[in-house]
């Protein structure tokens, strides 16, 4: 983790990461023995959420924290566990509300709240997962890192549009009521 932290510290990430994780410079960050290009979505979603909430997250430090506390496989090849985002937020003193249904994610964005959404891409738990940050901006819903090769944030009609009929919702996060704007 310390070696990756030193490597990641040398990669400058500015502003929100709206583009997909296969794009530079974020694709070259490391998580375990894996490049972010295939496994960094939870870290990117948490980074964007923190940025939106007014924090100044350090991507290298955030990746280090995920590597130490949230990897599914020790080598990072399976990314990180989206259910562990809550523990990282708690340790950082970040307020959040966790939910387990896509309807709750949709309701949160309709209320103007930012969300982190994690879901299985297919019908079984071995199909791979993706985790994204989504927020309404000027009445339009945008997803950051919507898919790995996205050139920028992606406009969608709803959270439901992210998932196909075979997708399984895993977990989501939004602001707790004390964070309302």
Predicted regions: what they are:
Residues 50-180:
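Conserved active-site-adjacent core of cysteine acyl-enzyme catalytic domains
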């Amino acid at each position: 983790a310390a070696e990756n932290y030193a490597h990641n510290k040398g990669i400058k990430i500015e502003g929100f990461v709206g583009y997909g994780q296969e794009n530079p410079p974020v694709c070259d960050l490391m998580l375990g023995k894996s490049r972010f290009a295939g496994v960094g979505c939870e870290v990117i979603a948490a980074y964007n959420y923190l940025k939106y909430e007014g924090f100044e997250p350090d991507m290298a430090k955030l990746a280090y924290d995920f590597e130490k506390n949230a990897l599914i496989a020790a080598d990072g090849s399976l990314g990180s566990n989206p259910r562990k985002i809550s523990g990282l937020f708690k340790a950082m003193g970040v307020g959040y509300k966790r939910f387990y249904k896509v309807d709750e994610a949709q309701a949160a964005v309709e209320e103007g709240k930012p969300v982190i959404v994690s879901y299985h891409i297919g019908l079984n738990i071995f199909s791979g997962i993706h985790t994204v940050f989504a927020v309404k901006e000027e009445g339009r819903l945008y997803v950051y890192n919507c898919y790995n090769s996205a050139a920028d944030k992606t406009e969608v009609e709803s959270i439901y549009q992210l998932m196909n009929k075979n997708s399984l919702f895993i977990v989501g996060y939004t602001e707790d009521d004390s964070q309302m704007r």
